[in-house]
Amino acid sequence: MSYAIIEIGGTQIRVEPGRFYEINHLDAAPEDSYVVDKVLLVKDGDNVTIGQPYVAGATVEGEILSHRRGRKVIVYKMQPKKKTRKKRGHRQELTRLLVKSISVNGTAIAEALEVDAKTPVVAG
């Protein structure tokens, strides 16, 4: 099983080819390709490469599937005995990213199977 740990949208995510992930909003149009070069770790079978801080020459190629909003989070603040109450909601802007391949020095170590955007195939 091959996977990589990438830094994208202010978070670190473990990604595998053929899967999609919900990440913080990216400024890219749907169906555009997206390349991440901030790769922290790459695992290919028994070989593990750890970057300091990033793995040199490693990239993760993906495709932007859609933009959406996350679940609503309710923030309720109240001060007892003062009749002070605040109720606010927040919905995070998210981007759905489909990972197509993981490459090191231009050589793909893991690629997704032929993928349909509506029904992603999980390799492995």
From Swiss-Prot:
GO CC terms, sorted: cytoplasm; ribonucleoprotein complex; ribosome
Cited SUPFAM superfamilies: L21p-like
Top-level taxon: Bacteria
Entry-linked PROSITE patterns: RIBOSOMAL_L21
One annotated GO biological process: translation
Keyword Ligase (UniProt): no
GO molecular function: rRNA binding; structural constituent of ribosome
Coiled coil: none
UniProtKB keywords: Ribonucleoprotein, Ribosomal protein, RNA-binding, rRNA-binding
Pfam families reported in the protein's UniProt record: Ribosomal_L21p
Record's function text: This protein binds to 23S rRNA in the presence of protein L20.
UniProt similarity note: Belongs to the bacterial ribosomal protein bL21 family.
NCBIfam families (UniProt xref): L21
Self-association state and partner proteins as the record states: Part of the 50S ribosomal subunit. Contacts protein L20.
HAMAP family the UniProt entry points to: Ribosomal_bL21
Protein name per the record: Large ribosomal subunit protein bL21
Organism: Synechocystis sp. (strain ATCC 27184 / PCC 6803 / Kazusa)
Gene: rplU
